[in-house]
């Protein structure tokens, strides 16, 4: 139906007869000449209809925005005064000699341009129209380009693209599963995979050596700006590689991707232990563009009379830290009060600070409500330890280790954004040496990553000191965003059972939920490991999109609903009967409580 795309025409095509298909972006009538901006996925070109071509002119007079047209005409140069430097096709136009209206269109509920502000609910309800917008066309074409580059890289490095099941069984991987009732197996359910984790490990046992998949994954969890109930993962697994080799291959992939697609050289990725990331930056995915660090001052506060600092300083489960903000003394008190409210979200009871007006005058040069409670020698030691200069602001955290780390870590990122402290555009990083386990609120242990991650010690040492064991895990971080996480896996049955035991999974539960994996580990499982990248998050970062929903064709809302299709939806009684399911009415008390939660 067409010979060329609208957006690719240039001066090199002048004189050619072309046939185009697309949508009417705009129609203008100037002095008896009709101009139609015709749009397709590659861009826009101007088509001119004049009264000499009577039939075409009359038809062109009827077209309206978003009509679908087929246009035949000759490419000609625009006059010098009408050249549009803002359009890729701005040097040329089409002199229309043929016109067919392929379809009409109702008036869209919003303008499909980059300048009109439209509520996201409206955009998602009419997603098929929203996707016609230039920004969305760019994002999805960019996504296709990225996945193609990733496939090419992995293919060149000997990886095989192998699909794994979507209908599987529930396994404890952290989030809630999406369950699918089985019609043929009464009272039993499939689960949609949270990741292809166990299947890709089994592929290594099967001898495929290098596997990858652009995989759909599903997690029934509360949503945020960077989360979706169904998301896409770049899933990778290898045999006979240690963590350094796996990190080298995957780092090479991301570096080549950024270089090929964005012409950006990320350089080598530095390594940082998890303990350092948490102590200095308050996050296991620190944004290294921000030149702010937490400095431990617990030892300086143990003997001060100010209980706000001395109490946590003498508590082994607490910490006292200081964070210097260069030239932060200009921050007004009203803004400091706002930051105090901000850290309270993370459990902080307050936000102490000192403004350094004159570091050499400890009596009069420090401005703060807390200075009067601190001896001069302590103030001097704090200034020296954080490297304070005149005009700086020092924030303090004093509470449990968890509260201080999370509160000042979040404040660090907020200050970086508010004060535009970024020192570079891109800051990649590997975070390594993660703890094997973390403590639950009930005092037990849970896997920091997942229960199939290999520890860096023997089964005996692991069982003797599980709380201090380190894992062979690694996370790739870029600009404070976790691009991907992975680990060397457990390939020995004894070690896997030892980990399950520490996690409180009984032998019976091990056999019920993971019997197939434990059996596979007995039949010559090779050393193996891998990594998974969040594709949606990666695209969001590379395009600069505000939300992950802007890089997915048909995303869900933050309440996990599709406004366009009205999913999830009710099903009829016959379908439920076939699945052996009966719905019970929610008790009125529960309905009332749910209503209260919605009101919040």
UniProtKB/Swiss-Prot annotation:
The keyword Cytoplasm applies. It is an enzyme of class 6 (ligase). GO terms for cellular component: cytoplasm. L-aspartate binds at residues 173, 219, 449, 489. PROSITE patterns: AA_TRNA_LIGASE_II. ATP binds at residues 219-221, 228, 482, 534-537. It holds the Pfam family GAD. GO terms for molecular function: aspartate-tRNA ligase activity; aspartate-tRNA(Asn) ligase activity; ATP binding; nucleic acid binding. Aspartyl-tRNA synthetase with relaxed tRNA specificity since it is able to aspartylate not only its cognate tRNA(Asp) but also tRNA(Asn). Reaction proceeds in two steps: L-aspartate is first activated by ATP to form Asp-AMP and then transferred to the acceptor end of tRNA(Asp/Asn). Belongs to the class-II aminoacyl-tRNA synthetase family. Type 1 subfamily. This is Aspartate--tRNA(Asp/Asn) ligase. It comes from Teredinibacter turnerae (strain ATCC 39867 / T7901). The gene is aspS.
